[in-house]
Amino acid sequence: GIGRRQRQMCIRDRLMTGRSLPEVMMILVPEAWEKHKTMSSSKKAFYQFNSCLMEPWDGPASIPFTDGDYIGALLDRNGLRPSRYSVTHDGYVIMSSETGVVDIEPENIKMHGRLEPGKMFLVNMNEGRIVEDDEIKNSIVKKYPYSKWVKSNILPLSKIPYRVKKSPKEKLNFETRLK
């Protein structure tokens, strides 16, 4: 499996190509998209296109990330690790495997939540706001014509014309070959 150092190098390399940190994380740890019945075709095209660049990392993990502009976390598509968050009225965001890790006065809690499989929790530090999963991903998948690229550049194996040649019959019997 991919270790922390390899994952960090992979993230860094993709950031150097001009992608945003949320986009890199979507590529590295995609949602379960192939058989998702209600996912938009543009989001499926994004995941299909990027699946040609690298294999998905399926965890199990809750992966925190930051680059100074964003701080966030995402849960792998299997969702086997718990990730819970609390947002306080005085501006703190706390994420951990369980609630109650940090003592917070009940009247200071603005909201509690749980990260779901394949979903991203993101704080835009420049705007000082939490960005919803749909908002993040919809803006990223509309950035380029992924559907067009998939249609014009990906050829399924079932569409490749080929002929199967029968292999010649072996002329030697088993005992002769063993000698």
PLM region spans:
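Conserved mixed alpha/beta core segments that line enzyme active sites in large multi-domain catalysts
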Residues: 20-124, 137-139, 171-175
